C-alpha cells in the first residue's frame, strides 16, 4: 500500500524592519503575511524569495525557515505553508494584484483584521518555542507544536 499523499506547497514570509512588520491586505480575504505557491522544480527558498519580489517589490536576503503551518483539505490533500522570516531586504515597497502591502508596528498588529492563524504565524516566527501550527478538527482550531 502506498503511503504517498497529495500535498500543496506554499510559503509566506514575515519581513521585519526594526519594530515594524510587513503585511498584505489580500484582495477578498483580509490581512496576511505575503506569500504564495512553490512552482514545480523550484526550491522552497527560491520560491519565498520570488514571491516576496512579486508581491512586495522587495528582494529579501537570507530568509530563515521558522516552521510550518499545515492542515488537511476536504479532498485529503495536505496544505503546507513554509513559514519564513527575513530581516534583510532591498528594493522599493510596492503592492501587487494580490493586495496592498504596508508596514505596521508590531504593537498594532493584533488590532488588524487578520485571517486564519496569522497571529500564530507571528508567534512561530518570533520564538524558538514552536515549529509547527496544525489545524486540528478534533480541537477545532490551531494547535502550536514545538
Predicted regions and their residues:
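Acidic/histidine-enriched, glycine/proline-rich intrinsically disordered or flexible terminal extensions
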Residues: 127-146
Amino acid at each position: 500500500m502506498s503511503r504517498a499523499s497529495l500535498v500543496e506547497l506554499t510559503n509566506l514570509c514575515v519581513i521585519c524592519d526594526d519594530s515594524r512588520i510587513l503585511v498584505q491586505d489580500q484582495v477578498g480575504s483580509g490581512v496576511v503575511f505575503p506569500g504564495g505557491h512553490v512552482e514545480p522544480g523550484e526550491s522552497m527558498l527560491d520560491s519565498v524569495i520570488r514571491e516576496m519580489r512579486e508581491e512586495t517589490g522587495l528582494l529579501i536576503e537570507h530568509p530563515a525557515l521558522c516552521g510550518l503551518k499545515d492542515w488537511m483539505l476536504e479532498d485529503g490533500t495536505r496544505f503546507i505553508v513554509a513559514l519564513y522570516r527575513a530581516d534583510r531586504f532591498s528594493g522599493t515597497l510596492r503592492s501587487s494584484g494580490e493586495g496592498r502591502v504596508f508596514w505596521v508596528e508590531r504593537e498594532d498588529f493584533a488590532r488588524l483584521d487578520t485571517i486564519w492563524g496569522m497571529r500564530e504565524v507571528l508567534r512561530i516566527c518570533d520564538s524558538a518555542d514552536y515549529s509547527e501550527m496544525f489545524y486540528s478538527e478534533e480541537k477545532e482550531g490551531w494547535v502550536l507544536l514545538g
